[in-house]
Amino acid sequence: MYGYLRTHAPELKVREQEYYRAVYCGLCRTMGKCTGQCSRMTLSYDFTLFALVRLALTGEDLTVKSRRCVAHPLRKRPMAEPTPALALCAYASAILAHYKVKDDLRDERGLKRTAASVVAPFIASMRRRSVRKGYGDMDSGVYLAMKELCELEASRIPSVDEPATLFGELMGKLLAYGLEGNEAKLAHTVGLRLGRWVYILDAADDYAEDVKYRRYNPLACLYADPSMTELTPHKREELKIALLAELAELECAFDLLDTADRPDLRGILSNILYEGMPRQIERVLFGDGECGCAREGQGRKRHYDRRRRKGDDHG
């Protein structure tokens, strides 16, 4: 996917880093088993977070073993054994990658289009394996959602909120797939907020290039100013506020995940929410400049940790 949903490694504890690496590498191995070895090339931080959230929702236990892999043949690494949560994320990743490549073939030019055309047959094979494994309804849902999103983007609607919500709804349905009741509702909320945040941040990240090559960008349609080839400082501040608001909504959803007996999983999710994602906002909107997102995230994390400790003490 996009690679924005990542940890900030310097702030992870050693055991949290090991847990995260086990899930990341375990997802990679599961993708190879479920959708073919080529699918491992589409491994992303984004679906690693999806896997972590699914583990929190389902309460699945991880079995971690030290293994070698093709990418790291000399040294064994902690690697989670396949679980239903990892398998679901493997299939969802393959299906979404297929429609993302189709989107690139339609919209991109030059080397990006050539690259998409080269990988398209392999990605299509991954998607077919997912359908054969019983995920045809997921495939149909992604197809319809992406079709609706493409039609909305083609209309060049002067809004970032509507396409962001459509993408968020898609992510929510993927994350909630197969769940019921409160778990499904919570998964959908987490996916919705993550999807909206990713869509808005990606639009900001691609703004200058999209304007240069006259590609669709929801922010360019919203601002409707052909002379604005780059986001102005004022627009960047507006986007920062909007993205932090999405993180605040996501915080409320993360707070409902039952991770009381899994401190490593809790610590990783907290790190991504309060350290990793704010730093992605800083990187995309302000480059190396300091905008206060990371400091604000750290402050919210300290408040979150205090609230959690009180809750655990009373539990």
Which sequence ranges carry the predicted segments?
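Acidic catalytic motifs of isoprenoid enzymes
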Residues: M1-E169, K173-T189, R196, I200-R236, ...
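Conserved, well-structured core segments
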Residues: A294-E296
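Long, low-complexity, intrinsically disordered segments
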Residues: R300-G315
